[in-house]
Amino acid sequence: MKILTLNTHSLAEENAAEKMQLFSGIIEQEQPEIMAFQEVNQTMAEPFINEKEVSGYQPVNGHEGKMRRDNYAASLVDELRKKGLFYYWTWIPV
């Protein structure tokens, strides 16, 4: 079993979009079964999205939060779907 953990620093990094492309390529190559990320960010300026429309998203009871359009996890999942990879995932705002 392959497990991947990463502190993404997501939107705080320079060239965040380019780094996401590289990261999604690594995930495509390695295809881990389980992934855990820290510092999965989103800006406060983006509009909220309907979580029911986000691919593979599974809410956690008692930890509901408003997901925004530039949420790093949601964006990464979109990139992975383009590569034919599907993951169930959740996001807990802290």
Locations of regions flagged by a protein language model:
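N-terminal, active-site-proximal structural segment of metallo-dependent hydrolase catalytic domains
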Residues: 1-92
